[in-house]
């Protein structure tokens, strides 16, 4: 049987929530606005499928380049290259540094 190569493959633990965190996210997280140059962490919320970046970017840190509708364009370093990913604010956290 051939291996499945879907968007969420090999994410059994990465895209799962602990029992206390299950359920919907706070609405303020969806309404959060970032400005250009803000540093954000990509932390995927598995309860929201829309605007979810690829799971390989989970845990990465990048800078906000611009806004695209409800989502944000974030520039993340992947290996030696910079890649632009589109993610909604539910999947982003503001960096404290």
From Swiss-Prot:
An example Gene Ontology biological process: translation
GO CC, one annotated term: ribonucleoprotein complex
Molecular function terms, GO-annotated: structural constituent of ribosome
Keywords (A to Z) from UniProt: Ribonucleoprotein, Ribosomal protein
Database matches in HAMAP family: Ribosomal_eL21 (MF_00369)
Protein family per UniProt: Belongs to the eukaryotic ribosomal protein eL21 family.
Record-linked NCBIfam families: PRK04306.1
Annotated protein name in UniProt: Large ribosomal subunit protein eL21
Organism: Methanococcus vannielii (strain ATCC 35089 / DSM 1224 / JCM 13029 / OCM 148 / SB)
Chain's gene name: rpl21e
